């Protein structure tokens, strides 16, 4: 079984030393969902929200969140991301918004946390912008879809049925 990399022999949390690692291209994709009433989703799709374009705002906030992950999660390294992508898609058949993020860099540590943070904070932004019309929206699940690069190898979730 793998060991927890952020816990030392004394059981103390610490930031992993990546100075000896080779720089490789690393990429991660994550997703999050925000489920809401059909009327709330229609308001977003039709651009009738009084606060403005919900998707455009969530996209920009998600990008900013990926870039600030190190500031939110203390044991994450500050990274020079080369790409952050945040895509939002309305899924009216499920009364929800799907958020998919992609983060990429050439570096010594992975970008899974950045992709997950981008998806999570974009979802929180949708909630924040729409809470005046619906407070019982549900955020989740949030999950890593895939990662590549680095010593631990590639990961990809199994296709959903």
Curated annotation (Swiss-Prot):
GO terms for MF: cyclic pyranopterin monophosphate synthase activity
Enzyme Commission no: 4.6.1.17
Gene3D superfamilies: Molybdopterin cofactor biosynthesis C (MoaC) domain
Pathway: Cofactor biosynthesis; molybdopterin biosynthesis
HAMAP family recorded: MoaC_B
EC supergroup of this enzyme: lyase
Active-site residues, as the UniProt record annotates them: 128
Database matches in InterPro entries: MoaC, MoaC_bact/euk, MoaC_sf, MoCo_biosynth_MoaA/MoaC, Mopterin_CF_biosynth-C_dom
The UniProt record lists the keyword Lyase: yes
Natural source organism: Shigella sonnei (strain Ss046)
Name of protein: Cyclic pyranopterin monophosphate synthase
Family to which the UniProt record says this protein belongs: Belongs to the MoaC family.
Catalytic activities: (8S)-3',8-cyclo-7,8-dihydroguanosine 5'-triphosphate = cyclic pyranopterin phosphate + diphosphate
Subunit structure: Homohexamer; trimer of dimers.
Origin: domain of life: Bacteria
Region forming the signal peptide: none
Pfam families attached to this UniProt entry: MoaC
Annotated positions binding substrate: 75-77, 113-114
